[in-house]
Curated annotation (Swiss-Prot):
InterPro entries: AceGlu_kinase-like_sf, Asp/Glu/Uridylate_kinase, G5K_ProB, Glu/AcGlu_kinase, Glu_5kinase, Glu_5kinase/COase_Synthase. GO terms for molecular function: ATP binding; glutamate 5-kinase activity. Pfam families: AA_kinase. Substrate binds at residues 54, 141, 153. It catalyses: L-glutamate + ATP = L-glutamyl 5-phosphate + ADP. Pathway: Amino-acid biosynthesis; L-proline biosynthesis; L-glutamate 5-semialdehyde from L-glutamate: step 1/2. This is Glutamate 5-kinase. The lineage of its organism: Bacteria, Bacillati, Actinomycetota, Actinomycetes, Micrococcales.
Length: 270
């Protein structure tokens, strides 16, 4: 189905949710529980849910006795190898409360670009969803190199949404929406709705926080949202703390209308 407004979110067949490193690692690791609560609620309504989760490298950093994100590729790969294991354990531990089983899917850019690999990935994802498994997707940082990386999981999330033909993509961040200028500045206004042909210039989404563990920003999120919308997937960009409201169709964050949408959302900005 094509979702033309937030009121249809509760009946979405397939939903992809993307969460960034800074939202679920370090001092924010406790947000995994509430995030899973929201995913489980949507799953319980009958929606097929896919989670695209960053955080392998960031989660692995303290286990390697490092104090900051490593700059060299080999140490990044080592941190990812350790962190991905811990991250999946944390998700499954939380999902156990709902009797939901997670399935780990690790992809590289080549897996999506190569037709044979893409077909295999799609088949596996389709089967997982048919079995009511909740796929948790991440870039395969342990084998990815600088030349074949997605660069950020916002782009990966858009590609996954296309791969599984999702009705909705929810891009989670540290702030609640796109703004006309940095949200901490006076006069900043939330952008509640972005139509397919709307031009976005000078928008802000705020910083990723002081941790420096993520790789995405406003431009990557807008680009990913546009990419998903181009293929008929509605997009909500909002804060991780608002994921429950977003998946209930509440007027939070910024709504990106899918390409074939004709109706304009009437919810006022706040």
């Amino acid at each position: 189905m094509t979702i033309d407004d937030r009121g249809q979110i509760r009946s979405a067949r397939r939903i992809v949710v993307k969460v960034g490193s800074s939202s679920i690692s370090g001092e924010n690791a406790g947000q995994i529980g509430p995030l899973v609560d929201a995913l489980a609620e949507a799953h319980g309504r009958g929606s097929q849910v896919v989670l695209v989760s960053s955080g392998a490298i960031a989660t692995g950093i303290p286990y390697l006795a490092l104090t900051e994100r490593p700059k060299d590729l080999a140490t990044q790969q080592a941190a990812a190898a350790v962190g991905q294991n811990v991250l999946i354990y944390r998700y499954q531990d939380s999902l156990d409360r709902y009797g939901i089983v997670a399935g780990q899917v690790l992809l590289t850019a080549r897996d999506v670009e190569n037709p044979t690999h893409r077909s295999n990935a799609k088949r596996a994802m389709e089967r997982l969803l048919d079995l009511r498994i909740l796929p948790i997707v991440n870039e395969n940082d342990t084998v990815a190199t600088h030349e074949i990386r997605f660069g950020d999981n916002d782009r990966l999330a858009a590609l996954v949404a296309k791969l599984v033909e999702a009705d909705l993509l929810v891009l989670l961040s540290d702030v609640d929406a796109l703004y006309t200028k940095p949200p901490q500045e006076s006069g900043a206004e939330r952008i509640a709705h972005v139509g397919w042909n709307d031009q976005l210039e000078g928008v802000e989404i705020g910083s990723a926080g002081p941790s420096g563990v993520g790789t995405g920003g406003a431009l990557t999120k807008v680009s990913a949202a546009r990419q998903a919308a181009e293929h008929g997937t509605a997009v909500v960009l909002t804060a991780t703390s608002l994921v429950v409201d977003a998946l209930r169709g509440e007027p939070v964050g910024t709504w990106f209308a899918p390409a074939q949408e004709t109706a304009v959302e009437s919810a006022p900005a706040s």
